């Protein structure tokens, strides 16, 4: 039988390559006569490291270049950290598969000087590094006595900056730390009561051409249904709020008693205004669950908070 060749577009960061290699290995292991190759490239978000992500804008910061490769026929699929994939995709492309989720929580990483502290008892004035407005807003709301500084670069670069003393601690996704072999650096898993995670955090999203039935069939073997249901609800929530990957919107989802329970949060940049609510709905209609939760938050003032944030972004 003739081998079927599949090309993956990927970011070239260490974490992106670890994730893409996992997808490659799983596909080749499960599908006979499949040859998978990888084309790695830098995205806009990888190149601009001296500006806070929120100031650049978030329309495909880490995805546009990969999508362009698929649209011109140079790649068949793109592997993304699902949290980086916008909810509205270019014409001709679709989210073809969502893989089994790693721990979606945020994690506290400290240097040796601060390994006796947890987030809740860090001394006043401790410097916390994060590039996420979502984490920033929630932690400012909970711990106004801490100092928050923007930190850019890949996971390894951020840990190096922490160990060099530029920060007392940093906040990173637990999933990325585990995938890179840095699980031992997780000092504390931050509970969802303190920080709701990003939409799609911990899961991989595989994007492909909407009409490529062969590729859709191939990647379907990696689909994890419970993860897919949860993440589709989270993405519908974000889409309904017309938010993006870089705004203070957080979620937590779980499946219980054959129902989908989604918690969502919208906060102001300073953390002083924070709206949080929950919606429980049909597990087989995750999009509706996300939309209904978004409507509940809108009724409580979420749109006003987000419009103020977008106005500030436009002024910068």
Swiss-Prot record:
> Can the keyword Zinc be found in this entry's annotation?
no
Cystine pairs: none
Entry keywords, A to Z:
Chlorophyll biosynthesis, Porphyrin biosynthesis, Transferase
Report the Pfam families cross-referenced here.
Porphobil_deam, Porphobil_deamC
Q: Which GO terms describe its biological process?
A: chlorophyll biosynthetic process; protoporphyrinogen IX biosynthetic process
UniProt modified residues of type S-(dipyrrolylmethanemethyl)cysteine? 245
Q: Determine the domain of life of the protein's source.
A: Bacteria
InterPro entries reported in the protein's UniProt record:
HemC (IPR000860), Porphobilin_deaminase_cofac_BS (IPR022419), Porphobilin_deaminase_N (IPR022417), Porphobilinogen_deaminase_C (IPR022418), Porphobilinogen_deaminase_C_sf (IPR036803)
**A GO molecular-function descriptor:** hydroxymethylbilane synthase activity
The record's GO CC annotations read: cytoplasm
Q: What class of enzyme is it?
A: transferase
Question: Does the record's keyword annotation contain rRNA-binding?
Answer: no
Biological or metabolic pathway of the protein? Porphyrin-containing compound metabolism; protoporphyrin-IX biosynthesis; coproporphyrinogen-III from 5-aminolevulinate: step 2/4; Porphyrin-containing compound metabolism; chlorophyll biosynthesis
Q: Which reaction does it catalyse?
A: 4 porphobilinogen + H2O = hydroxymethylbilane + 4 NH4(+)
Q: What cofactors does the UniProt entry give for this protein?
A: dipyrromethane
Q: Cofactor binding mode, per the note?
A: Binds 1 dipyrromethane group covalently.
Its Enzyme Commission number(s) read: 2.5.1.61
Q: What functional role does this protein have? A: Tetrapolymerization of the monopyrrole PBG into the hydroxymethylbilane pre-uroporphyrinogen in several discrete steps.
Q: How does it assemble?
A: Monomer.
Q: Which PANTHER family match?
A: PORPHOBILINOGEN DEAMINASE
The UniProt entry's sequence similarity note says: Belongs to the HMBS family.
Q: Which HAMAP family match?
A: Porphobil_deam
Give the misc comment.
The porphobilinogen subunits are added to the dipyrromethane group.
This one is known as Porphobilinogen deaminase
To which species is this protein native?
Answer: Prochlorococcus marinus (strain AS9601)
